[in-house]
């Protein structure tokens, strides 16, 4: 029955029903098929969303929206340009490094992609870069937003599995750096092949000036992530602190945030949060039912039948998560599937924190791969490019993501180094 419900969910998504409603309809089918008392559905929905730490999600989203409306992005881009703009394919590297910094402020790959696609794709095209290549770099580097802290998917993973969010944020640092390095290597190969130019000469004086101008914006992620890792604040308090700091900066340092603008951004945040929370509510019902059906035990037994090899089991789990990420929103995949796979992973000796990074990396690849491809489609929509022409370049960046995934999967120290 569990596999029937998963098939129903995927079928509803395929015919174009929004994933939040698809999850709700699947929950309704669950009630009919399993003869469950209807009152359990609202109870489980409330239970799945009635967690204080989930308040961090709208606050991190709001922080990203506020950041996009200020001049923070310009200062971060200038810093990235001074750091890596002198390399062959300079603007592509600037794009990646900027996404690393922006990931520390938004926690969302889609938010990063929406902002960066409007900035980098036109400017890279003007310097002679192929526009689809510029879009591919922008889309794939935005994935850093779900690995580098603060990461909204990691918050959801922590809530779902009762894993320390602080530890998850620490675990994302080294894999995030490896992932960014892979993107830069891929960009450099394309730059040499296509003879893309450098962006600027390296000047220590320019770097010093860029650091000085970006110092205040960079204090936001340092205080937010540093306070959380240091144990001074909870994830919810850290996200609220970040919002307050961005509001102060936008109002008093670059005068870019009026009350009207703040209201518009708040409304946009409410819309995005509503989508995420509907997914969380619907996923909690389906996830609970699948757990009650003892699906984790069934999967563990199936893996034992297929192979005794640890390596092959881990490859199969990664393959399953990769395919799942192509069809499901990250929030739904985490809430529905992680409670099923985590007992299997722990039984194999995988640390829950390490597994959280593996899950997020897999779902990051899924955000770039059709049919869902939420990040890729965001960039294509903003630039007017077709998915096919962007994928011609993006596929090589996706390969570098899979290489990073394999490194992190089979070298646990990359995720557990700071724990």
Specify the residue positions occupied by each region the protein language model found.
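Alpha-helical transmembrane segments of multi-pass membrane transport proteins
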Residues: 1-419
């Amino acid at each position: 029955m569990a596999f029937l419900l998963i098939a129903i969910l995927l079928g509803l998504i395929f015919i174009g029903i929004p994933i939040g409603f698809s999850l709700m309809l699947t929950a309704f089918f669950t009630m009919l098929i399993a003869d469950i008392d209807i009152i359990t559905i609202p109870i489980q929905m409330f239970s799945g969303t009635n967690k204080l730490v989930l308040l961090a999600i709208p606050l991190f989203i709001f922080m990203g929206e506020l950041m996009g409306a200020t001049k923070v992005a310009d200062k971060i881009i200038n810093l990235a340009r001074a750091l890596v703009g002198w390399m062959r394919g300079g603007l592509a590297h600037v794009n990646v490094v900027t996404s690393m910094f922006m990931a520390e402020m938004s926690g969302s790959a889609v938010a990063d992609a929406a902002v960066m696609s409007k900035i980098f794709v036109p400017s890279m095209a003007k310097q002679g870069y192929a526009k689809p290549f510029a879009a591919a770099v922008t889309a794939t580097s935005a994935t850093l937003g779900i690995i580098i802290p603060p990461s909204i998917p990691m918050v959801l993973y922590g809530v779902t599995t009762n894993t320390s969010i602080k530890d998850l944020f620490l675990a994302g640092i080294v894999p995030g750096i490896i992932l960014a390095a892979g993107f830069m290597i891929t960009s450099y190969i394309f730059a040499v092949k296509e003879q893309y130019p450098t962006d600027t000469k390296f000047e220590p004086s320019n770097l010093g000036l860029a650091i000085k101008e970006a110092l205040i914006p960079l204090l936001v992620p340092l205080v937010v992530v540093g306070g959380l890792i240091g144990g001074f604040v909870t994830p919810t308090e850290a996200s609220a602190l970040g919002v307050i700091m961005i509001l102060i900066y936008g109002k008093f340092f670059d005068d870019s945030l009026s009350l009207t603008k703040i209201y518009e951004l708040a409304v946009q945040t409410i819309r995005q949060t509503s989508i995420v929370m509907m997914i969380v509510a619907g996923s909690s019902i389906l996830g609970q039912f699948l757990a009650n059906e003892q699906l984790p035990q069934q999967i563990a037994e199936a893996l034992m039948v297929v192979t005794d090899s640890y390596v092959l089991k881990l490859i199969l789990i990664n393959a399953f998560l990769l395919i799942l990420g192509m069809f499901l929103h990250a929030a739904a995949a985490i809430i529905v599937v992680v409670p099923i796979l985590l007992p299997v992973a722990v039984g194999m000796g995988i640390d829950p924190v390490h597994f959280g990074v593996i899950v997020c990396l897999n779902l990051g690849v899924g955000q770039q791969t059709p049919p869902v491809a939420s990040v890729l489609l965001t960039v294509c929509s903003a630039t007017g490019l077709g998915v096919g022409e962007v994928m011609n370049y993006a596929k090589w960046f996706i390969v570098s993501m899979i290489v990073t995934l394999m490194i992190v999967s089979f070298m646990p120290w990359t995720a557990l180094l700071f724990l």
